Amino acid sequence: MRKCNLSSEEQAHYNADLLAYQNKAMRTLGLAYKFIPEDSGNDCAELVNEGNMIFLGIVAISDPIRPDVPEAVQKCQSAGIGVKIVTGDTPGTATEIARQIGLWKPENTDRNRITGVEFAALSDEEALDRVLDLKVMSRARPMDKQRLVQLLQQKGAVVAVTGDGTNDAPALNHAQVGLSMGTGTSVAKEASDITLLDDSFHSIATAVMWGRSLYKNIQRFIVFQLTINVVALASVLLGAFFGTELPLTVTQMLWVNLIMDTFAAMALASIPPSADVMNEKPRKTDDFIITKTMRKNILGVGFCFLAILMTLIVIIKQRPADLVGQALTQFFTIFVMLQFWNLFNASVFGTNHSVFKDSRHALGMLSVAIIILVGQILIVEFGGKVFRTEPMNFMTWVYIIAGTSFVLWIGEIYRWIKRIQKKD
């Protein structure tokens, strides 16, 4: 407007209109014209700089927030992920967009926003002091974005950057995770690690949920697998001290560790993602995958199983020689069934949910459970010398399956108590 024939009062009036539009998250364009001689050799930039233009008015363009963005931002914040807006828009427009998506709160102050020029003027020490508090950076230039990424990384943050333009390439390249838009430039796509085909921020929240759920499923399998291995190893080792023959044969361990565990891995890996993981805080990059809670579960459950199995070994040792084969078959079946029921507990490890809460989850686990149970029955009834088993009668099967199911019910009671305590 400074290039137009406007009085100071008119400029103030239009500037107020501009600010009002920007505070509504609208982008603005000013329109003006001038008459030029036909023989003028000046280019457009020179003609504009000469001034004396006739002002036509302002056009305000609204770019509405996608309906799913506020929810996605809220999910990310609940998950401990800090969201920051870095844009070339004006401070008013950027702040209003942040307010609309739920990022800017009434209690936020100027410490939580900055312009690119102000950010560049800060020393590294001053910028490091403010970088975690920043929510909005307006009028940002490419190097401002890159510097912000580097400062956040110095603070120990894992940084993901979204961008669609060529000027976003430096920040996309320096971030641990660069996310370009499907409609973005080829330069942005080449500098990024992932391209969002739907250009949706919601896809980022969904990807985080899937990633965390997959990580938790891996932890669940580790809990299940290590419990089996600890109990099996200790049973064989202590069984030798008790003076009994090998409690579990090589072929029996082959069934447990290769076949049964393969089906268990399939079941645990196929557990659908849960939105509950988005209420957890991020783990540190150097955290060991086996947590303190996992160690307690493995050792606690393993010790209980081992106590049961050692008691059985003592009983087997007192059996007449002609009944030892049947007793060892029962020992093997009890060992498998303890792990069988523990598989259900492992599937909800890290939550307070009931095994039966999610019908999809319960159906998938039930399918794998049936396969394992049928396999165990076939091995016992027809394994013979290969698996060192003898057929058992129907009631023995009922007693073993029902008796070992206490593992599941104790887990259900424990999780029920935890849910009650959480409500209180």
PLM regions: where:
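Membrane-embedded transport module
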Residues: I101, K105-V161, A175, G182-T351
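Cytosolic catalytic headpieces and adjacent flexible linkers of membrane translocases
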Residues: M1-L151, K155, A169, T183, ...
